[in-house]
Amino acid sequence: MARRKSRILAFQALYAWDAGMKDTDDLLSLQWASAEQLERIGEDGRAFARLIVSGTLSQIEQIDGAIKERLVNWEIERLNKVGLAVLRMSVYSLMFQKDIHPSIIIDEAVDISREYGDEQSYRFINGILGAVKTDLDKGILVVREGSAGQ
C-alpha cells in the first residue's frame, strides 16, 4: 500500500509536469504535495516517488516512443493527460525497474487510472502496458540503457 501511495504521488507529479504546471526541480522537491500525503508515505515512499519521476523524465523520449509504437490509429498527443501520466510512469517501471514484478506495475496502473481517469481509460492503459510487457519479454522492445534515474 505504501508503494501505491508513492505511485500516486509520482503520477500527480508527472501530470503536473505534462500540464506545464511544475518544472523538474519543483516536482522532485515534493513541496507541492500536502504534508499529510508526505507523512503517510514516509521517507522511503518519497524516495520511491522521486525515483519514478526522475527516471521517467530522464527516459521520456524512449518511453514515449514505446507508447507511440503500441498506439493503433491514435496519436500520443490526443491521449488525456491522466492516462498519459499513468502510462509514462508505468512504462518506465516496466522498462527499468526490473526488481518489481510486471503484474504489480500493471495492476497499480489500472487501479490508479480507475481512480483518477475516465471510465474507459483503465482498459486502454491495461492494453498498452500488456503490449509493452509482451514486447519486452519477446525482445521486440529493447531498452536503451543509460541514466534511468536509478
Regions found by a protein language model. Name each.
Residues 1-122, 126-150:
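N-terminal interaction/assembly modules
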